[in-house]
């Protein structure tokens, strides 16, 4: 109910009220620092939002994009990249910006509906047409001779979702526990020949360079590959268990106040929740939040059994346990071995 109330208020705000500034400039620019697989989404959305904003306020807005591995993008903002908004792969990366650089408040997730996640996704497998290696589930990825393409959890948000999805699968097996899950992901990463820094790099490795038997990654990138990048060359395999990936968005307060872009940057994030924004999201293969839009695209996004980040104790605990220096990933992955 709380999210519905906030969402209703946002939609009301989008439809009413004039631009707050007395004499806004005729044109304005802003920077969206995002994670790897959202390139097409925001290329599309930025055009739609600019048209909406021009009609509403008379002001022209240019949205510049920066895309890369979510962890690397967060570090760039911490180190001084002046993002008006960040749209990253997971909450921990925006928490890091709040904690280390103090560029936005610690309660940033409470400012927009659904904990500031206007879309979701999950982790699936992309295989070559005909599925020549007969890959059906996570257990097939640990078989000898299977080449798995996946990005690096130290730099990529999607890679961290990959890791947790595999861990959740292992835990769900008969007798599954932390020890057996660790053994399972150890075997899995032994089949990964190279770790790209970001999810899109891994997609390029698999789709364009023809390396590997299976790509583990974002559902959005898999759908993009099947429908556009390599039509007729690939197929999606949905594992028996995956993870609910919730990529969040946030206003970077210190930047928008310095650059006087708060009003347009705030509207930019709010419009993601509008029917028009949600349609752009779904067209670009992310799962929309708005039920009316989700129903129209239900065939594209079948129901799956998904673990949640809450089952790992939240992102702060998951990051410390699995991905921090000396954590589980460092313990199980040795490059070249």
Residue ranges and their predicted role:
Residues 24-155, 298, 334:
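N-terminal segment of the mature folded domain
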Residues 37-41, 45, 73, 82, ...:
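Stable alpha-helical elements in mature extracytoplasmic
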Residues 130-136, 155, 168-176, 255-263:
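Short helix-loop capping/hinge motifs at secondary-structure junctions, enriched
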Residues 256-337:
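Extracellular/periplasmic juxtamembrane helices and adjacent flexible linkers that interface
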